Amino acid sequence: MVMRRYISHLFTWVISFLTLLVFSSCLNEHPKDQLDGGGSNGSASEIFDTTIAPLYDFMGGTIDGEGIRDIQRLDSLLSLSPDDEQLYSSWQYLYRAIGMCNKSLDMIDLQSVRLTDNQKAQFKAEVRAIRAMMYYEAMDLYGRIPVLLSSAESLIYEPASGSSVTDEKLSAQSERSEIFHFIFSELQQVLPYLPQTSSLEEGSHYGRITQPVVNFLLAKLALNAEIYMYNDWAQGYRKRPKGRDLEFMVRTADGASLITGGKASENRSKILNAWETCIFYCNRLADEGCSLEEDEIFNSSVRYQMPKDALLMDEADSVQYSRPAKPLFRFRYTDVLLMKAEAMERNDGDGRAEYNMVRAHAGLPARKSSLANILEDRQVMLAGETCHRQDLIRFGKFLKSSHLRRSVQSALTSCSIVFPIPQRSLAFNGKLVQNKGYEAME
């Protein structure tokens, strides 16, 4: 049966979350330790310094056990126990970041009288984009996860769901497909409010979330939509939805047309399937000037010291830059071209041009853009990224990967496609339910 999925704006997501309890303290995290709203009562740049800049500092953390790089490695599958400390550290890291984003949104609302309407919209869009990226990572790792929102957002969705705040203020999980809808919708909504410049172009937006970063995430989500839209992964993926049957509402004109004074007729939308949606956002990145010569699109390890008047100036020499060695997020145009080639092949198209652009840039001869060849080159050319596990799952090779030790491979089942919910999180929040297949390990 054709599955029609229209992902366009926030109210679509409300309908799918009618039974979800959304509250703001699921994990007993304390984002106030990293964000102090007491000083954010000055200029717009000072509000930025206290609400947005700390999110990037936290995102670029390199402390062992902090972040998601380590557990994405295939050798980390030696331990899939809910008691694994690394699993809990990654869960804690992601939800602390989400909690910080929610607090930032609340702080921006409180300081809105000191911001123009455009500044407020842009600030909140940037925070929501960071939060969506963190939710994307959490969904990819753990499957069914809780959704936590800011205070203002919770007031909107709580009446719609008919839920009431419990004494514990804990949130239940949502299905992975619902999380996917939410993330995709959030990114589509914030896109027009973000700067169009490259995240790695020196200036006030250096190292920050910009439109190319969000377009990359939307392309990646669409490419993996077959996986994320299927909730019964414990039974394998034979019955997963087909990319041609998953439909997305995509803005085909300038999404910022109404914001920048354009005509309503310029703000058009079109229904595309999952593969066409991936191709669409990959093309957006090409239109934005991304290229193999300047391969990086985003690197969360970038550090900058923002000048006091950063919102008013773009001079490169006014910002100090540095970069630790271990980025948690790194997006490259090589990945974009390989994603587009794969999506074209899966949509009965021809991905040779994009595929062989990547090979030529690496000094390799042209060859057929078969799915097997694309996966092989992704494993080599994107070895430093955190997408190898994700790629193997999408290609149906994860449980048979030659990169896994034989002892590990024999122990894996379809349940292993997602990680278990950490036992410490389950103990704290009685509304969380362990992922299928891991119950006996508790």
What are these regions (language model features)?
Residues 2, 26-65, 81, 88, ...:
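Acidic, glycine-rich segments characteristic of secretory precursors and extracytoplasmic regions
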Residues 2-24, 214:
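Sec-dependent bacterial lipoprotein signal peptides
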Residues 25-29, 52, 94-97, 162-164, ...:
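Long, intrinsically disordered, low-complexity segments
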Residues 70-142, 166-206, 315-328, 333, ...:
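Conserved, well-structured interaction surfaces
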Residues 139-141, 146, 198, 224-233, ...:
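Short coil/turn linking the two alpha-helices of tandem helical-hairpin repeats
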Residues 226, 269-298:
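Polar, glycine-rich mid-to-C-terminal structural blocks
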Residues 296-358:
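C-terminal substrate/ligand-recognition segments
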